[in-house]
Amino acid sequence: MAAKDVKFGNDARVKMLRGVNVLADAVKVTLGPKGRNVVLDKSFGAPTITKDGVSVAREIELEDKFENMGAQMVKEVASKANDAAGDGTTTATVLAQAIITEGLKAVAAGMNPMDLKRGIDKAVASAVEELKALSVPCSDSKAIAQVGTISANSDETVGKLIAEAMDKVGKEGVITVEDGTGLEDELDVVEGMQFDRGYLSPYFINKPETGAVELESPFILLADKKISNIREMLPVLEAVAKAGKPLVIIAEDVEGEALATLVVNTMRGIVKVAAVKAPGFGDRRKAMLQDIATLTGGTVISEEIGMELEKATLEDLGQAKRVVINKDTTTIIDGVGEEAAIQGRVGQIRKQIEEATSDYDREKLQERVAKLAGGVAVIKVGAATEVEMKEKKARVDDALHATRAAVEEGVVAGGGVALVRVAAKLAGLTAQNEDQNVGIKVALRAMEAPLRQIVSNAGEEPSVVANNVKAGEGNYGYNAATEEYGNMIDFGILDPTKVTRSALQYAASVAGLMITTECMVTDMPKGDAPDLXAAGMGG
């Protein structure tokens, strides 16, 4: 086992604070409308340019093991804030740095670290309640656009695109961000249900100019099995041909003679058919087939429930106004399923979302709700170079998370003002003893840090602006972009309550642990390996 290097007390804390400051100073230059970019070197490809706090934090590793421990703990703050609300990572880092710096000063002055932590925790718990009281619901698209704009670093087009996307697909809808092809940002809304499976044979294409299969008011056969024997399908095919409508087959797979016969029938014009694989795998495939059945008013033909394909009738088939299938996707537009059944299915999936334990499962379930309830919007990010594209995509992603958080828990005045107001309200808060009271003061003083940093990045004097803002009340604050004082809500500078709350909670959690650290243990740096030749051989 490698030898360990151990540091105690003030020695350990000084080293740790140095690491915290290196990381926090690198991250906090990005805060606010006049925050700067950080360039990150990559081992291959062009460097990445970013204004996203968590991306900067993730890149930082320090050579000194003790300093690195401090940096890694603050990195955890940024990551946690990012996971919880998708934004506010820089604010969380600035708050953590402020609480740690003030807290360690108090420890050096002889305060009890455990009592300090209790005081900080008490102040933060009260601050979270105050934030909730200040919070205003965010429902109209103007407010949504403003939140998106602020989070995308004052990029108005991004804010408007997100608001428009939410308008079109609803609050439940799925909005994804992709690379665009041009220089402009675009919004693409997919009505109906789309899944990522294309046609099984290019011979089904009936619109050669677009390379797609378009079928008007088709029947939809849903089978949870592989179809390779055409005999199983003959009764259904004959019934569909009699009805004079096209048929879409969605099955685990269609292969061999079954696929060949369908292609021949289509080419001869006997019956228009198109076959696609069912989306997903395993249990998720079964669930998605059931979703499609609910949407189109059909039944999934599955041997698990004793149904056979040969005995299927037209009543078992779903219907839709239109189905469009291209190489990679299938879109079902206006299924004829009953609204009550669709809402029931959505309710069922929402229940599963509440019980889901992994983020991946939750995301997939939310996608299913969106496909049933609203639709899917894709924001295509345009840029001149790939480096700019990456940077912009990260900002749009942040803005999207921020607007979702705003819709969820409401908004408060932005620009660091909400935390300043909360701190002023809690000025009279006291705890069981003097050391805990100092802890409360440490947390309340730290709540000014985001405002001061925004002002400092804008090249103004933080103390002057902070005093002016504190002298005002309500939503009165400082707009760093235009260098004006006024009502932050009127300026359109809003922060999602969830983002501000998460930033404060995670910052205080990690800072409290670091203040109470008394000893640090790390591996000794390995010396150079001894030179084997020097041992000498008996001659």
Curated annotation (Swiss-Prot):
Effect of substituting residue 184 to Q: In strain: JCM 7000
Outcome of mutating residue 524 to L: In strain: JCM 7000
InterPro entries for this protein: Chaperonin_Cpn60_CS, Cpn60/GroEL, Cpn60/GroEL/TCP-1, GroEL-like_apical_dom_sf, GROEL-like_equatorial_sf, TCP-1-like_intermed_sf
Listed GO CC annotations: cytoplasm
Effect the entry attributes to changing residue 98 to S: In strain: JCM 7000
Binding site for ATP: 30-33, 51, 87-91, 415, 479-481, 495
Subcellular location per the Swiss-Prot or TrEMBL entry: Cytoplasm
Keyword Transmembrane helix: no
Result, substituting residue 167 to E: In strain: JCM 7000
Domain of life: Bacteria
Residues spanning the signal sequence: none
Subunit structure: Forms a cylinder of 14 subunits composed of two heptameric rings stacked back-to-back. Interacts with the co-chaperonin GroES.
NCBIfam families assigned: GroEL, PRK00013.1, PRK12849.1, PRK12850.1, PRK12851.1
Protein known as: Chaperonin GroEL
Gene field: groEL
